[in-house]
Amino acid sequence: MAREDSVKCLRCLLYALNLLFWLMSISVLAVSAWMRDYLNNVLTLTAETRVEEAVILTYFPVVHPVMIAVCCFLIIVGMLGYCGTVKRNLLLLAWYFGTLLVIFCVELACGVWTYEQEVMVPVQWSDMVTLKARMTNYGLPRYRWLTHAWNYFQREFKCCGVVYFTDWLEMTEMDWPPDSCCVREFPGCSKQAHQEDLSDLYQEGCGKKMYSFLRGTKQLQVLRFLGISIGVTQILAMILTITLLWALYYDRREPGTDQMLSLKNDTSQHLSCHSVELLKPSLSRIFEHTSMANSFNTHFEMEEL
């Protein structure tokens, strides 16, 4: 009974961990999609510069192939573990354990790689000034994607221009910066701020923000946190799976207490029936002798009369 209760407890815990795998996988997919859109805008602004190379080397090998592959595999593996737990199938549980171990090793290698990449970003502050060349095509019908990227980046990082908001006046034919440079954005806000109060515009340039973005570790820390969370959950799942495999394996080799009791009762009943069968001839002989004695006594009494 104690082993059966332990198996039930292990199965419930594995159900919960598989549900957690599905939720975390969906979260990783959402974060990867957000990071992809975010980085695509950065790549649009940094095309044909050394900054583009830095972005690709730092983030894309992790975000696209590894994170997406891990979350897709975890969804499938979670289903495999759920089926194995429900059916108590040793083969499915063994596959579940082996797949989790392989994914964990991949995540561990990915984490080590991101720590090494932190000091390998090939970008300097002087490279950020080259982004000014990407400002000349802002607002042109042929470069709507570039216009969208600049607006997205300035809103997201709360910056304006590359070094200062006056970069827009120097590099383009615009009389004032885009409206995305406004602290409180609305149509025509940049023109109003340029004519009345410049403090309504973001004063810091986007070059410094992007440099901090590339040299910093905020985004990599998010990826590491997700990787560590999934890794810890995988370790717990592997421990529970091994324990459940051990319990199910020995439960099949050794009969349970109820089976032993039923076997003992069946053996006792069989022995009782066998004993009765053995005693039947003796009882029949005793009955015959008793009948003969009674008939002899009756005959003797009749002769005396």
Swiss-Prot record:
The keyword ATP-binding does not apply. It is found in: Cell membrane. A lipid is attached at residues 9, 12, 83 (S-palmitoyl cysteine). Its main location: membrane. GO terms for cellular component: plasma membrane. Belongs to the tetraspanin (TM4SF) family. This is Tetraspanin-12. It comes from Mus musculus (Mouse).
